[in-house]
């Protein structure tokens, strides 16, 4: 028996002798309603052509939201679409040509070697380029990638990341911050270097400012005159923790074709089961995941099956279990499918500030993001949730699906939908399955429904139905 299993055994022994049996009895009827094959079918429906990749603000996302609401209301739950402003863009095409030494030409292959970010303005610009490390201007932290280079009228090229993992860099690692800094210094556009080119909608349009990403292998072609590579520069920045900016011997000709919709709306799908206790029903346990994806672009569908139709399907299965269970918990349970996670978390932020008026307090938050592939589900738990760790471990009995448990003590730029709940001091837990996942999956056309697996979604749904019921039924 390994250390983790030994610890679990001790926890179970420490609980009252009838605890696990009573927990199982309380949720048995609901658990029997959870079916992995139903979750897979939901993923297929949410990632089909009618939802157009579910980019919030687009009609395809609205179709997905209306369908999801119908799934909740068909169970007899109350529900609504919670609207908020969400501009969006659709990318129709683009091109990128780099000229080195005024003679050698490299044409980037769309989607493989470059892809405009989904908040870039449309247009065509030809300009010199400058490498600016992490693209960070933070004089208050004693760090400035722009200090010794002139970027006016040029493209800035940078990596995504920070000198180290200190939380002090979080603001400076946001796309919006980097774009603002570059634009204010007169740059005509920003070019990210990523290991793999992906679709990315998390930013705001700046007029006449173009934004794209290129692969590290394409950037290596631009570095031949310097005798350097992407790996060399990354290693230098990490080791020295000092700027290493310099002009590139490359003129970039970038064209972006996109349509922008500044007045579109997004929706959270909100549904709830009222608690049985006259007083405690004003408190709620929130169970959610983001419904949105990155959309359809350049004539291709980005289905978003694993990310995050899988999480949405699990929330629907858990809602079904609560309804079919018959025994309502003392607190209310609110089921939410958030919009705009991929565009900056606007949906979850809006919900956290706009609870349905009958609820006075959020007692806990459970979030699912990419839970459809693998054999275990890993968790990120806030310190305020740690007191219930024993109940979580006990809920795994007979399932053996619970993987690593990580404590969340600070927020990062990629923390997703847990952010507004963490800031409000709501005890929370986030879940993601352990994969593995193909390289062409994340924010790419390869994220298709045939890859998600019934067993992991069924076990995850049962685990968190048990645990969610416990949280909602606490005295």
Question: Residue ranges of each PLM-predicted region?
Answer:
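Extracellular/luminal Protease-associated
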Residues: 108-213, 274, 302, 320, ...
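N-terminal capping segment at the start of a domain
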Residues: 26-28, 33-59, 75, 80, ...
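Noncatalytic luminal/extracellular "stalk/propeptide" segments of secretory-pathway proteins
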Residues: 36, 44, 52-155, 160-163
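His/Asp/Glu-rich mid-to-C-terminal helical/loop segments that flank catalytic regions of hydrolases
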Residues: 214, 320, 324, 438-475
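Metal-dependent peptidase/peptidase-like ectodomains
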Residues: 107, 211-212, 219-230, 338-441
